Amino acid sequence: MSERNDRKVYVGRVVSDKMDKTVTVLVETYKTHKLYGKRVKYSKKYKTHDENNSAKLGDIVKIQETRPLSATKRFRLVEIVEESVII
């Protein structure tokens, strides 16, 4: 039971929802440079399984690591934290 809690959980923004049951989530993290101490922003895109096709472009979502679902999908959608406002 504790191994489920060891899985990585990230919060990111949906940048693509064109695939069926899959969204691409951009996760931004900050790391401190060892020598200079400056915070540097890193970003990475993760393909995420969205069973109900509920996440839309621009939504802020929480994703969790899971077993490999396809050649590129290793995460699943946990919840939609904030829905995007389309003007």
UniProtKB/Swiss-Prot annotation:
Query: What UniProt keywords are attached to this protein's entry?
Result: Ribonucleoprotein, Ribosomal protein, RNA-binding, rRNA-binding
Q: Which Pfam families match?
A: Ribosomal_S17 (PF00366)
GO BP annotations listed: translation
One term under GO cellular component: cytosolic small ribosomal subunit
Q: Name one GO molecular function term.
A: rRNA binding
Q: Which InterPro entries does this one have?
A: NA-bd_OB-fold (IPR012340), Ribosomal_uS17 (IPR000266), Ribosomal_uS17_bact/chlr (IPR019984), Ribosomal_uS17_CS (IPR019979)
The family note in this entry says: Belongs to the universal ribosomal protein uS17 family.
Known role = One of the primary rRNA binding proteins, it binds specifically to the 5'-end of 16S ribosomal RNA.
**Subunit structure, interactors included:** Part of the 30S ribosomal subunit.
- Give the protein's recorded name: Small ribosomal subunit protein uS17
